[in-house]
A protein has these predicted regions:
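PLP-dependent amino-acid enzyme catalytic core
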Residues: 1-173
Length: 173
């Protein structure tokens, strides 16, 4: 499913990092996705599952400060599903622009993430949209495709380092 939207991202052995660390180092380039982050994989899989369900949502809403919002925006636009993303005041402007560029309605509310999250729940009721948490099962299944690609290409790894924010990247591993 993910590869119907974009091809597998590359992974390369990095000689300079390998030399500096004293071991073989491979880097998986998730910056080659349409949103420059692995999270988009989860949005694609989640929205596909929701649209195939007995009761597809009329829209999605979520609070975030980053790539989760881009993921839902991109996948929602591809599926023709409206997406509203709520971010707190002072959120990174590059993230805000990216979320909007992928087609989501951006709402800026509250001084911190929790205030933005609470506002998203209020808007969920008003709009009749489905709320999306950043660690839902289908999101994690989609995110896991990065690990599948990596392990299909490099199968003798001792250690894997993964960025951890809300946890979908490590959960997908």
């Amino acid at each position: 499913l993910v590869h119907s939207v974009f091809p597998a991202t590359p992974q390369y052995k990095w000689p300079q990092l390998s030399e500096a660390s004293g071991c073989e180092v491979w880097v998986k380039h998730e910056n080659h996705t349409p949103t420059t982050a692995f999270k988009v994989r989860g949005g694609i899989v989640l929205i596909d599952a929701l649209m195939k369900s007995e009761n597809p949502p009329k829209g999605l809403i979520s609070a975030t400060i980053g790539n989760h919002g881009q993921s839902l925006a991109f996948a929602g636009k591809n599926a023709g599903l409206p997406v509203t993303i709520v971010v707190p005041e002072g959120n990174n402007e590059d993230q805000n622009r990216a979320i909007k560029s992928h087609g989501a309605t951006l709402v800026i509310h509250g001084h911190d993430f929790e205030a933005a999250r609470q506002h998203s729940l209020q808007l969920q009721d008003e709009l009749g949209y489905r709320a999306v948490a950043p660690f839902e099962r289908e999101l994690v299944l989609g995110v896991a495709t990065y690990a599948l690609e990596l392990f299909d290409h490099v199968n003798d790894l001792d250690t894997v380092y993964v960025p951890i924010g809300m946890g979908s990247g490590i959960a997908g591993l």
